[in-house]
């Protein structure tokens, strides 16, 4: 435990919070270009073919970003919007692609949680 004189001399050091999405440079989202679109398998207890894209951001960083939802239209050279948010069972994937923004289409046939997937309101739901 420090003495009062030691605290007067140096003071307490503040614990700084480390960012979990470093490549975004403190921005909420970043634009980028897909350099590779591929599928990969998750960690041990889970089994699937997860859709992932390698994206070069406008600040020069290159990141792996997850493509959420069922089906997508992304290919190489597609312009996408990238937000933070990791995928727990995919190591190295710490970003998500925003559906319904720029070149990324929304999820077709989505009726619930539509705003998360860029889906328009279906016609038959209106009364």
Swiss-Prot record:
Protein name: Small ribosomal subunit protein uS12
Keywords attached to this entry: Methylation, Ribonucleoprotein, Ribosomal protein, RNA-binding, rRNA-binding, tRNA-binding
Gene field: rpsL
Annotated positions of the 3-methylthioaspartic acid modification: 89
GO cellular component, one term: small ribosomal subunit
Alphabetized Pfam families for the sequence: Ribosom_S12_S23 (PF00164)
Ranges of biased composition (kind: Basic residues): 111-127
Gene3D superfamilies according to UniProt: Nucleic acid-binding proteins
Subunit structure, as described in the record: Part of the 30S ribosomal subunit. Contacts proteins S8 and S17. May interact with IF1 in the 30S initiation complex.
PANTHER family: 30S RIBOSOMAL PROTEIN S12 FAMILY MEMBER (PTHR11652)
Region described as Disordered: 101-127
């Amino acid at each position: 435990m420090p003495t009062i004189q030691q605290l007067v001399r140096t003071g307490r050091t503040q614990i700084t919070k480390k960012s979990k999405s470093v490549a975004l440079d403190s921005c909420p989202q970043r634009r980028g270009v897909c350099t590779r679109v591929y599928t990969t398998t998750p960690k041990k207890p889970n089994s699937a073919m997860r859709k992932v894209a390698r994206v070069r951001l406008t600040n020069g960083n290159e990141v792996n970003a997850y493509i959420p939802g069922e089906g997508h239209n992304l290919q190489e050279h597609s312009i996408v919007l990238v937000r933070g948010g990791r995928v727990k069972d995919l190591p190295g994937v710490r970003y998500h692609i925003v559906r319904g923004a720029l070149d990324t289409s929304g999820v077709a046939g989505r009726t619930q949680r539509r705003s998360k997937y860029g889906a328009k309101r279906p016609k038959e739901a209106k009364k």
